[in-house]
């Protein structure tokens, strides 16, 4: 079995209840939120400077003068949470240019002022601005002319280092972990408050609207919303939402973005006594997710963890259900940084974000965690929610149960 450090798993199960730091703010950018001790590695400017040093090392290794960054996920990573909101044309998105000791934002005259006022103030970036009628490519070509460059996507003769950047950004820094622990409870709150207050007979679409409102009200952005009424998710595991009314029960899964990071969670509510078939599916999904969580340690191999999950699927009487939906993925600056497949052998690393998504019939058991040396730390903790106690090889885990109304 892939479970590590069995003797320590029970004591570290408290990490499944970690709550967010205080001091959250209802803005999308993290520069106005800091923990009390800015010297602990959670200060945003210090985080950007640390990434500058990583880029300097990458440039030295590649023997190049500069790095061009165009992909939005890398923009968010290297600015520690910056975002180009309100830019519908991907070719007009801002870019970044790094040398070993300096950094620039490449932006249009339409967006430059807002970026520096609301996203990047005080972070040490300089500006290279293009008139909106020029387009980004002309300025980038001029800036990189006769320079030996690396970039995160193919451009002229640049060496592409997308894989190297992906590996670097998956390792969440202390600042990013602090931001992660603010985002997660916002996702949990949106799901649980909606389950507690929604009425029967409202449509899946109205449920999705409530989830969106609760996120946006607190400065988080809904990315993916799935609402399944009365077993619709048995037919469609990635179900979106429709005009179907909720009569007996509802399962909802929510992915949100804040500080350029992503977290996902699910909850389910029943009106009246739960449908016996659905309750059996939900109980099985909770056991399977607990199996995954118990093995979420640094150096664990996804292939082995998924094999253990398949064994639990068989034990619960749902042998083939794992084939119908992805079971988990690494998350961070993209909603899905890497899907976990039965063939995946890349070992987990400490400070990766991970989402486990067990699905059985109409039921989902989904949450996001931080992989740490002390065990899996729950990023999307329940607030005031019924919990199901599950033992895995002697260790106890708590999974969100059905809310009965």
Residue positions per predicted region:
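Active-site neighborhoods and metal-handling regions in enzymes and metal-associated proteins
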Residues: 10-405
């Amino acid at each position: 079995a892939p479970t590590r450090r069995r003797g320590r798993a029970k004591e570290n199960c408290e990490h499944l209840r970690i709550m967010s730091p205080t001091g959250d703010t209802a803005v999308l950018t993290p520069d106005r939120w800091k923990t009390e001790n800015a010297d602990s590695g959670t200060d945003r400017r210090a985080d950007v400077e640390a990434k500058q040093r990583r880029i300097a090392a990458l440039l030295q290794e590649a023997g190049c003068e500069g790095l061009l960054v165009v992909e939005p996920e890398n923009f968010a990573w290297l600015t520690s949470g910056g975002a180009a909101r309100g830019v519908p044309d991907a070719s007009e998105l801002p870019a970044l240019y790094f040398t070993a000791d300096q950094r620039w934002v490449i932006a249009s005259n339409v967006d430059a002022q807002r970026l520096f006022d609301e996203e990047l103030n005080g972070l040490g970036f300089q500006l290279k601005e293009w008139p909106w009628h020029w387009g980004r490519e002309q300025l980038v070509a001029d800036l990189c002319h006769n320079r030996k460059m690396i970039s995160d996507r193919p451009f002229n003769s640049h060496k592409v280092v997308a894989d190297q950047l992906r590996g670097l950004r998956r390792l969440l820094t202390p600042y990013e972990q602090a931001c992660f622990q603010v985002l997660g409870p916002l996702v949990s709150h949106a799901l649980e408050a909606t389950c507690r207050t929604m009425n029967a007979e409202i449509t899946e679409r109205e449920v999705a609207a409530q989830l969106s409102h609760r996120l946006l009200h607190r400065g988080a952005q809904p990315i993916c919303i799935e609402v399944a009424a009365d077993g619709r998710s048995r037919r469609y595991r990635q179900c979106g939402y429709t005009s179907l009314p909720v009569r007996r029960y509802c399962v909802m899964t929510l992915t949100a973005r804040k500080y350029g990071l992503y977290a996902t969670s699910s909850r389910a509510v029943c009106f009246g006594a739960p449908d016996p078939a659905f309750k059996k599916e939900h109980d099985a999904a909770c056991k399977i997710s607990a199996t995954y969580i118990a093995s979420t340690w640094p150096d664990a191999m996804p292939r082995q963890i998924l094999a253990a999950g398949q064994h639990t699927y068989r034990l619960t009487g749902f042998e083939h259900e794992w084939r119908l939906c992805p079971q988990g993925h690494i998350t961070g600056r993209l909603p899905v940084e890497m899907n976990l497949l039965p063939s995946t052998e890349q070992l987990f690393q400490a400070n990766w974000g991970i989402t486990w998504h067990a699905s059985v019939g109409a039921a989902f058991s989904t949450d996001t965690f931080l992989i740490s040396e002390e065990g899996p730390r729950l990023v999307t903790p329940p607030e005031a929610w019924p919990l199901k106690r599950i033992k895995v090889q002697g260790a106890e885990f708590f999974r969100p149960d059905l809310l009965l109304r």
